[in-house]
Every structure is written in structure tokens, then in C-alpha cells.
Amino acid sequence: MDTQPAARRVLILGGARSGKSSFAERMLAESADTRPVTYAATAPRYPGDAEWAERIAKHRAQRPSAWRTVETGADPGALAELLRAADGPVLADCLTLWLTSAMDAVDAWDEAAWAAGRAPRRLGVLTGSVLAAFAHAREPVVAVSNELGFGLVPPDPGSRRFRDELGRLNQGFAAAADDVWLVVAGLPLRLK
């Protein structure tokens, strides 16, 4: 199966530990574009969480040494800026953690802020900006995201809101993408 990113914009979806990140990394590593990849790490750092730090270190160690890592987790606006300024291929991993940071930044977990409309407006600005940056990217971009819609309905409003917002974000990225893949149990399936 040809997995070369001939397309400029690629979205790779999958569940937790589905192999989606490995597939994205392989896709870019095997690309005909030999320029170094910028790896946009959207995960925030959690001081004192040794297991999380170990995960980050493991991911970093398995990427090619020529790749440049840019951590965007502390600032949800940084991913859109990086996509607009890119001068080579970008791997954005992952939109799920990006959305977590964005929702943190706009108090989207707070029921009163959400009900008053402040949080949805502010979140809309952030999601609109990152989606526009992806849609108009001048360089190849491979974006990775979780597909949460296959699971159970979350029991609390904040978790349901997150699932719904991620579903909308994934739909926006899929509409703008040239190629969309779903990875299940390490097996990639081209959707678009």
C-alpha cells in the first residue's frame, strides 16, 4: 500500500495506542521530501508526572535525530503559528492534546463560562485559527488525532463537551485534508 504523503495535508485518526503516531512518523520518514521534519509536540508538560515524562522521552527517542521538536503544549495558539511559518514538513501530534490545552486556556471545562458563551467563543477563535493554518499550509502537514466517537457517551458534561468539540475539530481537519487515514490495531485504512 502506498503511504507516501503526496498530498500537502494529511489527517491520521485512530484510538489510543492504535499505531496512528507511528504510522504518521513512518509516512514522513519514508517521504521523498528529504528536508527535516518539524515535530509539533502538542502535549503539555506535567511537572512531577514521571510516567508522562517517560512517554515524552520514548516518543522523542523513536523519531529520526534530524527532526526538530517544537513543544506547543503550553500555548494553544503556537500550533497555528508554527503551521503558518513552516519551512518544511510538519507532523502535528496530536490534535487531541492540542484541544485539551485549548479548552484549559479558555476555561471551557467551567460550566458557567461555557453557558455564558465566553468559553465557546474563545475556543472557536483558537480552533478556527489552527484549522485555517492547516487548510492553507504551504508545506506538507501530517496531523494526528484521536477518534473518540466510537466509545461510550461520557458520564459528565465536560467530557461530553470535549468529545463533541474533538469530533467537530476532526471533521474540519478532514474536510481540509487531501488524505485522511484511520489506523486500527496498527493497520492503516485510507478514508479519503
Predicted regions and their residues:
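Short loop/turn elements that form and flank the Walker-type P-loop nucleotide-binding site
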Residues: P5-A6, A85-A86, D93, H136-R138
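Conserved inter-motif catalytic segment of the P-loop NTP-binding fold
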Residues: G48-S129
